[in-house]
Amino acid sequence: MCGSALAFLTAALLSLHNCQRGPALVLGAAWVFSLVLGLGQSEHNRCGSANVVSCARCLQLGPECGWCVQEDFVSGGSGSERCDTVSSLISKGCPVDSIEYLSVHVVTSSENEINTQVTPGEVSVQLHPGAEANFMLKVRPLKKYPVDLYYLVDVSASMHNNIEKLNSVGNDLSKKMALYSRDFRLGFGSYVDKTVSPYISIHPERIHNQCSDYNLDCMPPHGYIHVLSLTENITEFEKAVHRQKISGNIDTPEGGFDAMLQAAVCESHIGWRKEAKRLLLVMTDQTSHLALDSKLAGIVVPNDGNCHLKNNVYVKSTTMEHPSLGQLSEKLIDNNINVIFAVQGKQFHWYKDLLPLLPGAIAGEIESKAANLNNLVVEAYKKIISEVKVQLENQVHGVHFNITAICPDGARKPGISGCGNVTSNDEVLFNVTVVMKTCDIMGGKNYAIIKPIGFNETTKVHIHRSCSCQCENHRGLKGQCAEAAPDPKCPQCDDSRCHFDEDQFPSETCKPQEDQPVCSGRGVCICGKCLCHKTKLGRVYGQYCEKDDFSCPYLHGDVCAGHGECEGGRCQCFSGWEGDRCQCPSASAQHCVNSKGQVCSGRGTCVCGRCECTDPRSIGRLCEHCPTCHLSCSENWNCLQCLHPHNLSQAALDQCKSSCAVMEQHRMDQTSECLSGPSYLRIFFIIFIVTFLIGLLKVLIIRQVILQWNNNKIKSSSDYRMSASKKDKLILQSVCTRAVTYRREKPEEIKMDISKLNAQEAFRCNF
């Protein structure tokens, strides 16, 4: 804290020198000097190290350090002491003009400002290692944005009823959007899936009509077709939708992400306007394929993220993979597109779970036949324009950005969370803090981009690193940039190249231990000191090149989760963060404290607000339950030998008298409760007989059930015949049956006496 205050006051002092003259300068300098001197004496002076022999090394010690380049600067006859705090150098007689220091400058571009929503458009920040700079970013939403709304519709057969609703949506939606936009345009595109097996049927009879199961005439399947560019002509939009036919495929997921990426990057084909709010409405009732799904069809070429429309048809559908969620999110943000998922059915929750991975996206559930589609679009748009969030792009190595949103209601939130319920008259402020830990390997100028999500304007932050002294570039002062000339026997190196004979210089002093490599295998030994290698991964440093800033744990692709700096293989977290990866907010430790103020009841460690018990005997959310932690038996186990003192030494007997004198003895009956040892053979036969009897009983029961079922069937058949015989014989039809002729070898003689019947008597059958 003191170092930061000294740096601030030092900058104020030198600013007074540059901006004032005469008595005002003297009074101002004296006032600032007194403050600096008082602060400087309250803490150990790290700038006055005797090992500092150069200006560059001096300025690396801290932001409060300075180097006097005055040629005849001598203090107390003890030699040159050019490195010290700025206040001490002034007190020793060094003129302010002769003090080298690393200042922090923030310059915002006020001239030629073209941004109207995000200001400032450009910021220039000059930093040195260990310093930080602040500036404010303002975001003001405009009234009645121009809006470009592109319908991307899943035209598989199951969406037939929803597509019919689109015929009348254009005119009604344009009337509702007129309340929020002065310029509203609509466009239309369709998608199904990749036109290869196993996503579609390649049978000759179905290749041109995938939805024959629905008794419908369908168009051939396709990956993505751009049907209508963005237009103000609502009638043309309705005609394009009316001409649209459905298609089909055979698997459940669709190729929605493929089509979304093409609709986002094909800016000229779609007709996206730079000044408009860009909305991409995706209508579907199924999930979408993700990256690597195309391996099933033998498609292994990764999606390149470029536009591949030819005659408004996506021509790389069968040769290029589906995009990943990260790639799709990047393209949507780069092209300032907000996505609205209009999903019907149970797949709504699948898309809702994706929203944290797609910044600026919103999911809504549509009713049967898309009856609420217009209201869904309007409500989603109102939510989009009421949220202001920012995202950092083109992260600069060695530079950390900390962004805090200051909402119109006064609330402060992390920049990635942003503010909600923002109206067109509100202004959202973002406090941006830039911290540079070390100088970049390549040096020079870099920049980062702060981008409000969904806005077509950004803020470009230029980073200027102050890693060297001005006296090194001034021929007349170059001799005062170091106290002593280097050893002529040692080679001169420029931190990147060094030509010398390794056998010429001993390397024993460059090893932390004799059995370890020179400079930890990551540097060369020159004159008894390690010169560490340069690497693109980060900075290697330390007396033996044993430290670096890239070997720390990573989280989500960022070292120390982006909330800390890597020093010596361990994460040094920024304020407000903790954990081995700096992944936990500091406030999460409060959830690990019990009512007595103990962290995890003294039996564990707190990791991201959850206790990890280090004592294997303890359990519970706060490791508060430990049934065996205080058992006297385990505590007095060593006293057991005192019960049999015959073979103990005198020292052991003395310990028994002192440590185990008050031990209570509890004798236990060790008589076995079992009358005899277990008979394994008897147990086996018992289990075998019981199992056999149970199986036999099951067989008998099943047999009885089958017999009962057969008897019931025979009985029901007999009852049926009996009921037929009891019917009135007068209503029976003729009983004339088919005559069966047969022959016997010796037919038996049958004598029959049939009396004649009268002609008037009817033939009667007697049964």
Swiss-Prot record:
Span of domain I-EGF: 471-494, 498-546, 547-583, 584-624
Binding site for Mg(2+): D154, S156, E254
The keyword Calcium belongs to this UniProt entry's keyword annotation: yes
Residue ranges the record marks as coiled coil: none
VWFA domain residues: 146-384
Transmembrane segments: 682-702
Glycan-modified residues: N233, N402, N421, N431, N456, N647
Compartments reported by the entry: Cell membrane
Pfam families recorded: EGF_2 (PF07974), EGF_integrin (PF23105), EGF_Teneurin (PF23106), Integrin_beta (PF00362), PSI_integrin (PF17205)
Protein name: Integrin beta-8
Source organism: Mus musculus
